[in-house]
A protein has these predicted regions:
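Serine/proline-rich low-complexity intrinsically disordered segments, especially terminal tails, linkers
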Residues: 6, 17-20, 133
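Bacterial Sec-dependent signal peptides at the C-terminal "C-region" and cleavage site
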Residues: 13-27
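Low-complexity, Ser/Thr/Pro/Gly-rich disordered linker/stalk regions
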Residues: 23-244
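Bacterial N-terminal signal peptides that target proteins for export
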Residues: 1-12
Length: 244
């Protein structure tokens, strides 16, 4: 039978042991929201005069980033002015679970050329793992290990307003373990879907910007609220004020 002193000691020891099965604390891991007033949050920022931090059109806070692109940025068959975010380990390692979000604003409707408005690619082997593609106002989301189209949003990418993307992913080469979920403008458009989300041992990284089939038509995109976190709540931006 424990004495009073023994019970106090036991309770004290129990207080130092974490509860088994307790959920990890919610955490914002990284922000690329330009609230520094520059591009310093991004290790992989484009070096281009077409890129500037702006204050007139923002999703939240004081700053966003505008890209005014043309085929002067042509590389191969694509015009590319893009930001890269490489999650810190274990960000895209086997079994890691993450949420990512970003918001885009188009001053004018995209052309009917293929545009990428957020995608993940492998380092070293340079292979896309999943992508949001746009033609005009039409969107689609697909995974690539192997290719599967998960969502088509015809007429959803309207110009003159902000659009919010959120992605929940468990990184795995095993199609029975990996999964994706997608939200667009606050609505879940892809329920949890099992799929391989890694192709090989190479880490994945995120790219966003003006990435399109090369075209003579100048186009612009404004980017804000790029976030990596451990919960949907932590990547969800505040509600939009009317008119934005």
């Amino acid at each position: 039978m424990l004495t009073s002193a023994g019970r106090c000691l036991l309770l004290g020891l129990m207080g130092t042991v974490p509860l088994l099965g307790a959920a990890p604390p919610a955490q914002v891991i990284w922000r690329g929201d330009f609230e520094t007033g520059n591009l310093d949050q991004w290790k992989g920022a484009p070096k281009s005069d077409a890129v500037k931090v702006v204050q007139d059109i923002v999703r939240e806070g004081k700053y966003a980033c505008r890209i005014d692109g043309s085929n002067a940025a042509r590389r191969g068959s694509l015009d590319r002015i893009e930001f890269q975010h490489q999650p810190e380990p274990p960000g895209t390692a086997e079994g890691t679970e993450r949420y990512f979000s970003w918001s885009v604003y188009l001053p004018k409707k995209f052309s009917d050329a293929v545009h990428h408005v957020g995608y993940f690619e492998t380092r070293n082997s340079w292979s896309q793992l999943m992508s949001f593609e746009a033609k005009g106002e039409d969107l689609k989301f697909s995974t690539r290990v192997p290719y599967k189209l998960h969502w088509t949003g015809n007429g959803k990418l309207t110009p003159g307003r902000w659009h919010d993307f959120a992605l929940h992913v468990l990184w795995s080469r095993d199609p029975a373990k990996g999964f994706v979920e997608v939200w667009f403008d606050g609505e879940k458009v892809v329920p949890l879907a099992k799929t391989a989300t890694l192709r090989d041992e190479n880490v994945a990284f995120f790219q966003i910007g003006l990435i399109r089939e090369t075209s003579d038509v100048p186009e612009s995109i404004i980017i804000d609220h790029v976030v990596e976190a451990t919960t949907l709540k932590d990547v969800t931006p505040p509600p939009l004020p009317k008119g934005r």
